[in-house]
Amino acid sequence: MSCILFTMKQKYIFFCVLFVMLVPPAAKGGNVVWHEGGAVTYTMQSKVSTVVTKAASLFEDDMKALTGNECYESNQGEVAVYQLDMASNKELKALEMQQVPLLKFIARKDAFWIGKRGNQVVIVGSNGRGAAYGLLELSRMSGVSVWKWWGDIVPKRRQHLEIDENLDKIEVPSVEYRGINIDDTQWSSGPWARNYLKEQLSDGLLGPAYYHKLFELMLRLKANTISAGWDKKVSVFLDVKGNREVADSFSMIVATPDHDGTVTLHEHKKPVDIKILYADDGYGYMLARSNDDVKQASHGAALYHLSYEGQPHDYLWLCTTQPGLVCSEMQTAYTCGANRLWLVTIHDPKVAAYQLNLFMDMAWDIRTVTPTTVQQHLQNWLGVQFGKQVAARLIKPLITFYRLSGIRRPEFMGWNEAPKAGVNPIFSNENKVNNTDFSAEEFGNELERYLNNYDSLSLSVLKLEDVIPDNLKGSYFAMVEYPIMSSAAMATKILQAQEARHIGRIASFHHDREALEPAARSVTVSYTHLRAHETDS
């Protein structure tokens, strides 16, 4: 009998184990579908700021690009959007009934809460910008890149949209004012605006059509402050009719420089002045403006360049500032008290896409990136643009690129200086191209090694182009290939010319194999590749 009972126990245990194996475990914070098929719908509270309607328009475009279906406002939307500083008592009570933690962020500027309540995704902003940021955060979480328009990043079509089942998060900015200074636009943004946006303005000025597109990007980046022509003219942004109005429609704050080392922010009727504590030296390294100011001020401003025009040398072509340097310097500035305003100078947002994204991510949440995690941040960013598999293969080439360009920016390869103001570059001794410090005789021929590294790098990014989807090849070229191939071509041009100048046997040059090998390095592939893309565009 005991033998039979033991057998029955074994059978019982066996079936229990089998049942546990077959039944899936309960989800712990898994994803749930918040939209499945048809049009995406959203509900808006009765009164909102204009910036929220601007964000809603972007959200509609995003959802249509994602799903292939229209997106529109509805009384029973899948997404509900609230703006606390304009909410009615009835709307506030409804949020309290849904257990939205209002007291934790209602008094924090630009903050928002996003969470799942029943069948709705609920977004609550403390003000208009906060609500706009929250709505566009849902776009990002659904698979839309910040660079959808500026970088031509086409979202991957999705049959359904998911969200974390336990999503319940508050986001509050680390830096109160997060801004862009658009400068030196005569080289890129100015001509582009004239050709494509049909803004016929004088050289270096940008109008409301350009700023409308820039402010859309800034909403996605969670920025809130704009300045223009910082080093050229105090009111260059306000000089153009319509700029102030479009800034107000996006709730953007206009910043102007003062001569006493402060920044004036025109947010309310009474301007706000903030002391500049740190500014970079033009090369990406932060310097304290005044030790006394740093000691006395607890909340100040930090200014940073991702493009630069002036002495000793410009860099207005490519953005090659190392991400690790941006991260380290801005964290230092924040820790030392420059935590109220961050302002970054660019001449074209598309050229500085990743570094600008990194800068604004840190301004929004200083904890999001550290010097030890910046590489993962870059890989994640690449994954959003081109997919995780491409990002995993692309991260090492980009690290190599930033290392090589960190040794010498492509704009600096002439080992010269920009001509002083008012001096014709043709007659400037400072502008003369000189031999570099790269040696062909020392350190195991570091000159050839530098060129070989660029050769290998160029080949790797060209091979990767084969796995890029056709609708992203243009974006891949602009964000990855062009900077790398152009930098490689510049290094080849300058360093091969240096090699040729050092050949002592000029008369026998064409019979000298040792001399011909470095001089005969072909840039045909690079040139043809760049020209082909130029023709296509």
Residue ranges: model-predicted function:
Residues G29-V172:
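Contiguous, structured surface segment used for ligand recognition
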Residues D248, D260-A297, L451, D455, ...:
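Gly/Pro-rich turn-and-neighbor structural signature
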Residues H529-D536:
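Single conserved hydrophobic/aromatic residue that forms the stacking wall/gate
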Residues Y12-M21:
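Sec-dependent N-terminal signal peptides
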Residues R367-I426:
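Charged, amphipathic alpha-helical linkers/stalks
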Residues V234-V254:
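Aromatic-lined substrate-binding rim segments of carbohydrate-active enzymes
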Residues H299-C319:
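Active-site clefts of carbohydrate-active enzymes
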Residues W150-D203, Y210, E216-G229, S298:
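An acidic-aromatic substrate-binding cleft motif
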